[in-house]
């Protein structure tokens, strides 16, 4: 049996302050929910080992402050991400409207090799609340328009769809990590035209 090197998947969670990013992360990693969370200052992360298609991987899940005054986390925070999770509150339409800005912010800062196909996952959180303002079809339509991003409706408080959502996040992140590894091991070959080949042969001739 061949031993595989340990895989670390970096997952970034973005969204406005108060949408439940920290709650989702804690529900998934620690199976806990609390109403006493303080606003995340800067960035924080939790790790969890999970099985993805018979492969053990470590997910490093990064939580960010949603307030604009903390939005200067910089390139180092985003770089190396394997998946980006965009979270909004289904009871707060403004948090849905800012998904475009968060997605653009990530693509600018992270500069992924293939931005068109970089894996995003969208979570519409707080479905346990009654005063819903963002319809499922509206959220699905936005995701479809952005290269068909996977969409889950979640409740961090009631643990609804949290496990399923993060399974998809882990699987998509692993796929991204594998593609990056393949690209790094087998970069695009340098093509020589006939003149270059002839010149190279002539220079290497010692006669």
From Swiss-Prot:
Keyword Disulfide bond annotated: no
Cofactor: Mg(2+)
Phosphoserine: residues bearing it: 72
Modified how: Deubiquitination at Lys-191 and Lys-194 by USP32. Phosphorylated at Ser-72 by LRRK1; phosphorylation is dependent on protein kinase C (PKC) activation of LRRK1.
Short name of one Pfam family: Ras
Motif mapping: Switch 2: 67-82
Gene field: RAB7A
Assigned GO CC terms: autophagosome membrane; cytosol; exocytic vesicle; late endosome; late endosome membrane; lipid droplet; lysosomal membrane; lysosome
Catalytic function, reaction form: GTP + H2O = GDP + phosphate + H(+)
Keywords: Acetylation, Autophagy, Cytoplasmic vesicle, Endosome, GTP-binding, Hydrolase, Isopeptide bond, Lipid degradation, Lipid droplet, Lipid metabolism, Lipoprotein, Lysosome, Magnesium, Membrane, Metal-binding, Methylation, Mitochondrion, Nucleotide-binding, Phosphoprotein, Prenylation, Protein transport, Transport, Ubl conjugation
TM segment ranges: none
Name recorded for this polypeptide: Ras-related protein Rab-7a
Membrane topology: Peripheral membrane protein
Residues the record lists as Cysteine methyl ester modifications: 207
EC number: 3.6.5.2
N-acetylthreonine, modified sites: 2
Organism encoding this protein: Canis lupus familiaris
Function: The small GTPases Rab are key regulators of intracellular membrane trafficking, from the formation of transport vesicles to their fusion with membranes. Rabs cycle between an inactive GDP-bound form and an active GTP-bound form that is able to recruit to membranes different sets of downstream effectors directly responsible for vesicle formation, movement, tethering and fusion. In its active state, RAB7A binds to a variety of effector proteins playing a key role in the regulation of endo-lysosomal trafficking.
GO biological process per UniProt: early endosome to late endosome transport; endosome to lysosome transport; endosome to plasma membrane protein transport; epidermal growth factor catabolic process; lipid catabolic process; lipophagy; phagosome acidification; phagosome-lysosome fusion
Positions with a binding annotation for GTP: 17-23, 34-35, 37, 40, 66, 125-126, 128, 156-157
Localization in the cell: Cytoplasmic vesicle, Phagosome membrane; Late endosome membrane; Lysosome membrane; Melanosome membrane
Domain note: Switch I, switch II and the interswitch regions are characteristic of Rab GTPases and mediate the interactions with Rab downstream effectors. The switch regions undergo conformational changes upon nucleotide binding which drive interaction with specific sets of effector proteins, with most effectors only binding to GTP-bound Rab.
Keyword Lipoprotein: yes
GO molecular function: G protein activity; GTP binding
Family in the record: Belongs to the small GTPase superfamily. Rab family.
């Amino acid at each position: 049996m061949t031993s595989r090197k340990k895989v670390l998947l970096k997952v970034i969670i973005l969204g406005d302050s108060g949408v439940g990013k920290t709650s989702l992360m804690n529900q998934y990693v620690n199976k806990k929910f609390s109403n006493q969370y303080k606003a995340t200052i800067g960035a924080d992360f939790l790790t969890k080992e999970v099985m993805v298609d018979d492969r053990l991987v470590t997910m490093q899940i990064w939580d960010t402050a949603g307030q604009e005054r903390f939005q200067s986390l910089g390139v180092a925070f985003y770089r190396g991400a394997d998946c980006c999770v965009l979270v909004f509150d289904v009871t707060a339409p403004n948090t849905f409207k800012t998904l475009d800005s968060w997605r653009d912010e990530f693509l600018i800062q992270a500069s992924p090799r293939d931005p068109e196909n970089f894996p995003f996952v969208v979570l519409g959180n707080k479905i346990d609340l009654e005063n819903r303002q963002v319809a499922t079809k509206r959220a699905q339509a936005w995701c479809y328009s952005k290269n068909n991003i996977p969409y889950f409706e979640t409740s961090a408080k009631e643990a609804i769809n949290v496990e399923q959502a993060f399974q998809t996040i882990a699987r998509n992140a692993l796929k991204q990590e594998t593609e990056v590894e393949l690209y790094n091991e087998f970069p695009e070959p340098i093509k020589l035209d006939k003149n270059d080949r002839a010149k190279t042969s002539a220079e290497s001739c010692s006669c």
